[in-house]
Amino acid sequence: MCGFVGFVGGTDNQSEVLTKMMDRIVHRGPDMGGQFIDGRVALGFRRLSILDLTEAGAQPMANEDGSVVIVFNGEIYNFQELRSELEAKGYKFHCGADTESLLHGYEEWGEAVLDRLRGMYAFVIWDKKKNKLFGARDIFGIKPLYYYPMADAGDGAPGVLFGSEIKSFLDYPHFHKAVNKKALRPYMTLQYSATEETFFEGVYKLPPAHYFTVDIPTGKMNIERYWDCDYSAVEKPFEEYVDELDEVVHESVEAHRIADVKVASFLSGGVDSSYIAACLMPDKTFSVGFDYKNFNETNYAKELSDKLGVENVRKMITADEFFGALDDIQYHMDEPQSNLSSVPLWFLAEMARKDVTVVLSGEGADELFGGYAYYEDTVPVRKYKKMVPLPIRRALGNLALHMPYFKGHNFLVKGAEIPEKSFLGQALVWPEREVDGVLKPEYNTGDGAFELAAPIYARVKGQPELVKKQYLDMNMWLPGDILLKADKMCMAHSLELRVPFLDRKVMEFAEHIPDRYRINENGNKQVLRHAANKSLPDEWATRPKVGFPVPIVYWLREQKWYDYVKEYFTAPWASEFFDTDELMHLLDLHFAGKGDFQRKIYTPLVFLVWYKRFFIDEDQSSVQAA
């Protein structure tokens, strides 16, 4: 695990600029740093040593003649198989790191090396002979990769910035920092940055399962998808699926435990993280809760750890710690992200790093195996579907979509089985119809959430309703929220997080499970729960999703935290983005106990915390430094 930065450009003092960019991400790799500069191409690397702890595994790493150079963040779990195949073809290896297998793999197979990789990765390769860059991101988007095309990179020629974190771009002299005015509208609905162009104007995320090439002389960038899900049900007995999944998960955990350092696991007490912990059997598990009333569920994690004979390390988070960390959290996130679980994850990673360098966690199981409650129909909707033929339900649902919002609107739309018009996934903070009333017109110009979802739904046209929902989450919610915060919060503390459910072999198995084995009258995630039951006590395999419940609904009714939020909502610069009177109205109603508006308050708050850190505090510190 590590972080990398780089650019193609003609700026003065290339090494000095590259060092400053690398210093921005030293948390991703505190063990070692390295540079490579060749003309206009500059690569920088910060290393967190996990495989081959010697300097032989350092990056940037070049092949024998120096014609191909790589910077790589992540882990390739099948690197030993690739190495054996490449050695048979005559390639020489000089270290035990997986980076070298990826490097020589590119030499042998070119861009097709991506079809052979099993792992989490983001990398950029400088191919001197072809005078091009080749960069890619893993199929799920576990590891981040950003880029910033420049028409003039400082020498009159086109160029590009690229790296693991956007903040590294701030130190490039020809980077223009500005808020992307189109990003705020979908964020208000979804709570995360859902557009390929980030909250920094002109900075883009490379989507999961995509690669790019950059022709150095012309600056032309080409982006292609190299992998996609293949949802096609394969009929076989339920018990056979259960047995096979248990084998697949155990094998994935075994592959994900490879390291030359200690490996532990996060544990919430829910079935996903519990299953991983039971397969891994680490020396330690780590859990967090909140020091407030009934918001501490770490007792479940402690109980399971005791049953497994594993030490459980726990921490209780206070309100002061929660709000005190928001500024640093949004800095490390790079973009606003108002998933409340980012904060407990921050403290969880901080705690775990005191003991270990690598942790395994249960992210991805809900998306692959149908674990979210919103994948299921409510009892009234199920009855409606049984009683009323689909053509009639479709007609009523489409009629409702063309009418002003009314009570029963969502019921009719959900019953119509048209998720393209009704389903956006986990986080629905501000309904799209309400965003217009709180955003200033200048920042209400971007695509809405359903417009962003449309091309994703188009790729699974004709698939069952459940598949469409899972596919949308796989392409929006999972990389945009779950995996991004997992990477950023853990790497902020120099901790590598691995996710065995999000494995190529696990996905190739999961995509063929019939829908009725995922969700049925017995509940959700059925195949996974029965597989987990082989390794867990009965009560754990059937436990509901736990996550990180946060008591912010109560904290916002305390004077101290009301005043904290009010200071942001009434700041002079806040009115550039929001109707701050409307925000204060919601805050006052919530404070008085006249409604629960915690998420509608927290989402704009997080944006303002992010904006202040990057566009006010950052600029002030730059002036002082000058």
Language model region names:
Residues 1-4, 20, 157, 171, ...:
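Adenosyl-5′-phosphate
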Residues 327-331, 353, 375-377, 555-557:
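Short low-complexity, flexible loop/linker segments enriched in glycine and/or proline
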Residues 347-403, 464, 477, 483-506:
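Active-site adenylate/phosphate-handling loop in enzymes that bind or generate adenylated species
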Residues 120, 124, 337-349, 388-394, ...:
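Short, basic, helix/turn surface patches
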Residues 71-72, 183, 244, 339-343, ...:
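A conserved catalytic-core signature of glycosyltransferases
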Residues 132-133, 143-144, 170, 367-371, ...:
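Short catalytic/ligand-binding loop motif for oxyanion handling, primarily in non-cytosolic enzymes
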Residues 1-333, 345, 349, 534, ...:
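Cysteine-centered catalytic environments shared across enzyme families
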Residues 90-93, 335, 589-594:
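A short glycine/serine-rich beta->alpha loop
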